[in-house]
Every structure is written in structure tokens, then in C-alpha cells.
Amino acid sequence: GYTFQFISYTSLFSGSSIDEGTLLLIENIKLPGDGLILDIGCGYGVIGVVAAKLNPKLRVYMTDINPLAVKTARQNARLNRVEDRVVVLEGDRYEPVKGLLFNAIYSNPPLSAGMKIVEDIVLGARDHLSRNGFAQFVLAKGGEYLEREARKTYSIVEATSRKGYILLYLKP
């Protein structure tokens, strides 16, 4: 197995411990063999750091709009010795990675930011995936609605319900 260490701040989402949704995603994470992946709305970097550690062939991009989250995600990449293959960028949604295509995109999107932003992240992933790329999202509230919307946008939609969350696996 692997051991991970994370520092956080109580002002960040789930700052005192890793939340159930993120745990559900990392316990069920599907990783491509290589290439670029994205952890969008990364917070203090749990998903991206775990992915980087599990597969050293991946180049991991992480984005967040919160400067403290970006700084902390960088610290956590260093702490877990994956900083050589992790890039953490500050910015809104997909803006910091414009023009890049990813083999996989992951997120536990920030419901506190509102459904519009969550919808942009989930439905917008399609435009940022490589030809054989896929996305995995974990959603609490609004999961059923977004699952229905995703079925209009993606050719493959797998939804797993667990502990009040919906884990979505999406392929264009």
C-alpha cells in the first residue's frame, strides 16, 4: 500500500479531514496508463497527489480558484514527493488549462460555489478530454440532475450511488 501525508487549513473545504466524497472517488479512481490528467477544483490536492503517486507515468495538473488551496496543493505534492510531475495552477474552472487535452479529469466539485459552476465543470469536461479520455466526478446534492444532463452530452455514463454520493464515470 501507499502512505500519504497532507497538510491543510480549516478555511479550506474539508480542511480538518478528507471528506467522504473525495474518499469515495480515490477508492474507486480509474487511472490512464500515462499522459496528462486534471484535478479541477483541487482544494489541498488530495485527488491529484494520490493519482501522481499511484502512477508515476502521469503528468498531473491541478487547478483551484483559491490561492491558499493552490499553495497548499503545491506543499502536499512536495510532501508526498510527486512535485516533479505535478503542476498546480490558480484560476477559475478550465481557464488555467485552456488548450490542453487530458486523458482523465477528476473532481469533487464545490457545491458551495453553486450548481452553475458544478455543471460547467461536469459538462465542460468533454471539451478538455483527449480522444480516449474519461472523467470521474463525485457529487452529493444535485447528482441525479447532473447524471441526467451528462447523458445528453456523453456517450458513456456510469453512475454508482454510495453513502449519499453519486460517482460518475463519463466518456465522450
Question: Which residue stretches match the model-derived regions?
Answer:
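Class I SAM-dependent transferase core
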Residues: G1-P32
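Conserved SAM/SAH cofactor-binding pocket of Class I
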Residues: E20-K98, A104-S107
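Short "lid" loop at the C-terminus of a central beta-strand within the Rossmann-like core
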Residues: L111-A113, A140-Y145
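General small-molecule cofactor/ligand-binding pocket signal
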Residues: I7, Y61, V87-L89, V157-T160
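Conserved beta-strand signature within the Rossmann-like core of class I S-adenosyl-L-methionine
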Residues: N132-L139
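A short SAM/SAH-binding and catalytic strip from SAM-dependent methyltransferases
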Residues: N103-K116
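A short glycine-rich, Lys/Arg-flanked "PGG" loop and its adjoining helix->strand segment in the class I
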Residues: E119-R131
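Active-site capping/gating segments
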Residues: G143-P172
